[in-house]
């Protein structure tokens, strides 16, 4: 979580396993694309930096954050990936829609992690304002996509222990 004391893009480089032989899926919501595209770029750049081949990064765009659960399951089952990163952004509005979407995608991704054998990483920003999202998509709090990619590499490495 980004706070005044922690930047999402700060991590111990040496603690991240090499991704040379890994295949990573990335499910990306198109909604709030001005946020999700920089998140995706942060994830891809980090994966490449840690040895994942560009050919082994499979990106699937979906209309919105709610669809990330389905896309993540699809990537895990159809593309034989070692981990999936779900990237989305939900900003609170004037209706309860925010709560329904956040709860649905959180429960969906949790269920995929319980039922499946491919780790699905929660790279979804749930913010009160667009400014908060921007600050976590490459702004002053770093990039949640970078954090999600590091988590994916570490979780994919669990299978190799």
Swiss-Prot record:
Catalytic activity, EC: 2.5.1.78
GO-annotated biological processes: riboflavin biosynthetic process
Residues binding (2S)-2-hydroxy-3-oxobutyl phosphate: 94-95, 136
A GO term, aspect molecular function: 6,7-dimethyl-8-ribityllumazine synthase activity
UniProtKB keywords: Riboflavin biosynthesis, Transferase
GO cellular component: cytosol; riboflavin synthase complex
Enzyme class, first EC level, given as a word: transferase
InterPro entries: LS (IPR034964), LS/RS (IPR002180), LS/RS_sf (IPR036467)
Positions annotated to bind 5-amino-6-(D-ribitylamino)uracil: 31, 65-67, 89-91, 122
Pathway: Cofactor biosynthesis; riboflavin biosynthesis; riboflavin from 2-hydroxy-3-oxobutyl phosphate and 5-amino-6-(D-ribitylamino)uracil: step 1/2
Keyword presence, NAD: no
Catalytic activity: (2S)-2-hydroxy-3-oxobutyl phosphate + 5-amino-6-(D-ribitylamino)uracil = 6,7-dimethyl-8-(1-D-ribityl)lumazine + phosphate + 2 H2O + H(+)
Catalytic residues of the enzyme: 97 (proton donor)
Keyword Lipoprotein among UniProt keywords: no
Chain's role: Catalyzes the formation of 6,7-dimethyl-8-ribityllumazine by condensation of 5-amino-6-(D-ribitylamino)uracil with 3,4-dihydroxy-2-butanone 4-phosphate. This is the penultimate step in the biosynthesis of riboflavin.
PANTHER family, per database record: 6,7-DIMETHYL-8-RIBITYLLUMAZINE SYNTHASE, 6,7-DIMETHYL-8-RIBITYLLUMAZINE SYNTHASE DMRL SYNTHASE LUMAZINE SYNTHASE
Family: Belongs to the DMRL synthase family.
Name under which the protein is recorded: 6,7-dimethyl-8-ribityllumazine synthase
